[in-house]
Amino acid sequence: MKNLILLFTLFSAALSFSQEEKNKEQEKIVEEFLTNCAEKYNYTIQMAEWQECLDNGLKKDSTIAYLWQQKAMPYFKARKYEIAMPFLDKAVKFNPKRWQSYRGFMKCIFTKSYKDAIADFEDCKKKFGNSYVMDHSYDFYIAISYLQLNEYEKAEKLLQNYVTEMLEKRNGLEHHTAYFYLGITKYELKKYEEAIAIYDKALKIYPNFSDVKYHKAICLLLTGKNDDAKEMLSQAKEDFKKGYKLNEDNVFYETYPYQLQGYFLGL
């Protein structure tokens, strides 16, 4: 028995050392072909050069998930989704813990493949727990996906839980985007007074949030508060023109669900 334990210990140590060595080799490849090659180019105007560097790195080791993700990322930003997704699938294949939730995010916000996004996030929750990606929990993106699939009650429940969880488990943290989308679910469920109350919470955090003011104006109008609605809409228009908009990191590349557009305001 002692010999078996010793043998197992030695085998485990050998595996650990082998993985360490592999990680070091992969880091060298990433440095050579991403840091010192691809990143010398601007992928917006030099996509071919960027991709060639990464391809050369993958010839050295095709299992480096980060290089696959870096191949995918600029294509997503260029809205070439069908080119991008197979590369991201490769990243998930080789490192699901790191990249599957990111793929769920890309499906939710970029490709608008909401059922697929839900499937990715639910699978991540089973395997890794309800963690965070791109500033929000997996449940937040599942809720956004349900919102876009007109399953408003499911979205409402998840967003309410998300808001409550932040308050209780993250030292009273509140997020204006979370309140914005929770307010949207209330609006879609015709709970207009509740939506207004939620929007006010968002405005307490981000007083010039034009998207919230626009949707609050709609709820005010639908509850017969015409003068208040007119004033709120006027504020939304002015704040929008000043650039006070939905400020998630990726709004530069994609339109988020229910995001205020200039033409909504006659601009």
Question: Where is each model-derived feature located?
Answer:
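Bacterial Sec-dependent N-terminal signal peptides
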Residues: 1-26
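Terminal, low-structured helical/coil segments at or just beyond the last alpha-helical repeat
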Residues: 21-28, 173, 222, 226-267
